[in-house]
Amino acid sequence: MVPVLRNAEARDLWATAAEVARLAEAARSGRATRDELSGSTITITSLGPRGGIVTTPIINAPEVAIVGVNRIVERPAIRGGMVVPRLSMNLSSSFDHRIVDGYTAAEFIQRIRSLLETPARIFMEA
């Protein structure tokens, strides 16, 4: 079951979080309505808590895309010429290229990456 967050573009971060919590509780308790579980265009799935580092998410028809959020792991990174530990997370995605151009899909994923790397931007742009 995938609860559907409607009008996400019109919500601020706090309203989005509240609605996600409400929908998740309705789905877990079996009280979600048919309307709350259908009509979506994109799914965000998280296999990170199950240990997924790299996944290949499958689009839920008739949606146009799915984005998989994977586990955060510590990896070596170079900072100032030194190798240092850095937390890193892979995003996996699948897009229906009959509907979404690959370049547009890549820009979308890069935008998500940018916001996750600098979360303060979420508040600045709201």
Protein language model annotation of sequence segments:
Residues M1-A126:
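C-terminal catalytic/motor cores of large multi-domain enzyme assemblies
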